[in-house]
Curated annotation (Swiss-Prot):
GO terms for biological process: translation. GO terms for cellular component: ribonucleoprotein complex; ribosome. PANTHER family: 60S RIBOSOMAL PROTEIN L23A (PTHR11620). Part of the 50S ribosomal subunit. Contacts protein L29, and trigger factor when it is bound to the ribosome. Belongs to the universal ribosomal protein uL23 family. Keywords: Ribonucleoprotein, Ribosomal protein, RNA-binding, rRNA-binding. SUPFAM superfamilies: Ribosomal proteins S24e, L23 and L15e (SSF54189). One of the early assembly proteins it binds 23S rRNA. One of the proteins that surrounds the polypeptide exit tunnel on the outside of the ribosome. Forms the main docking site for trigger factor binding to the ribosome. This is Large ribosomal subunit protein uL23. The keyword Transferase does not apply.
Amino acid sequence: MNQERLYKVLLGPVISEKAAMAAEIANQAVFKVVSDASKSEIKAAVEKLFNVSVEGVRVLNVKGKTKRTRYGMGRRSDWKKAYVTLAEGSEIDFESGE
């Protein structure tokens, strides 16, 4: 895989209550990824950027919500979410700025 592509696969972490519980209970990290990313690309990107070993990746497509604006109904974009299961002893800490 192209190194440049690996840097563009991950768009950012998903910070939510459900993601925090997944990190504590199942040693998982949750990321927002580009919509055409594959599981193998996501795994390679996380291993390269965070220097951790990844056991598995599960992905899901999140449908954009329909929102009402002053000009009528609008729709937010669809996006892809990835649950990355880390190996025992590996962890990613998003809260510290290091």
